[in-house]
Amino acid sequence: MFSLASRRALVSGAGAPGGIGIAIAKTLKDLGAEVFITSTTDRIHERAKEIGVTGLVADLTIESDCEALIAKVGSIDILVNNAGMTSQNDPLGADEASDLTGVTLEAWQRGMKRNLDTAFNLTKCALPALRKSKSGRIIMVSSVTGGLMAMSHQPVYAAAKAAMLGLMRSLALDEAKYGITCNAILPGWIETDTQSAHEKLQGMKTPLARNGRPEEIAGLVGWLASESSGYMTGQTLIVDGGNSIQEERAQ
């Protein structure tokens, strides 16, 4: 029931070698899917070659790029919206890391483009193909930040990630008649190549006293992409080591 043989998957935000996106792509491939990954730079071809999938360059903030991407991929059964990042990982995003009074409209729009418009554009362009699948899967990789909690000086990122959940629920309702399910995963502190020392320390304060691994997010994506998850839609799955259930945190 976990086999994805004969299924075709598109995963966004898979450019970082130690990131969640590449772990998702590898898991889907291992389950038998034909996998396409996308990022904004040519390094996506290196990532794709490493795990034996197809890499395509696209700027998902531009609708025409998304249209061209979908045209290249063709039929799609599984869409994983993983593109996005916090402002600290974007060289242009320093003015997003502020309380709301310090956030310019330009900074707000940039953060929304990076973390919300990418999912909107790609999903909109992929829907005709997903509807033809008859059992399509849309999986949003959001965050506990915004989706469940908040972080000081990250109003743009939190708002965008929370908005992904509203989009997910609307899609779950509207696309059910086509056999499409849509769900979201909310990762907590995950150890990736771009994780800061502060983030790594926070992960050690969870009840499980460690950071999560990209493969632990990828495994859940694999299940959501499979036949076994067919009766689940419009739901959020929290993967944070129990961090959100504790009232007191270790010092």
Language-model segments: residues:
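Catalytic loop of short-chain dehydrogenase/reductase
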Residues: G13, P17, D99, V103-L105, ...
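Canonical Rossmann dinucleotide-binding motif of NAD(H)/NADP(H)-dependent dehydrogenases/reductases
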Residues: F2-F36
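Catalytic Tyr-X3-Lys loop
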Residues: M85, S98-F120, I139, M164, ...
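Conserved mid-core segment of classical short-chain dehydrogenase/reductases
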Residues: T86-Q109, K132, H153-V156, T194-S196, ...
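Amphipathic alpha-helical dimer-interface segment in Rossmann-like NAD(P)H-dependent oxidoreductases
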Residues: R110-K132, A172-L173, K177, S226
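Short C-terminal tail/terminal secondary-structure segment
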Residues: G222, T233-Q251
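A conserved structural motif in NAD(P)-dependent oxidoreductases
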Residues: T206-I217, S228
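Short, small/polar-rich loop/turn modules that mediate ligand/substrate recognition or access, typified
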Residues: S135, A176, T181, M232-G234
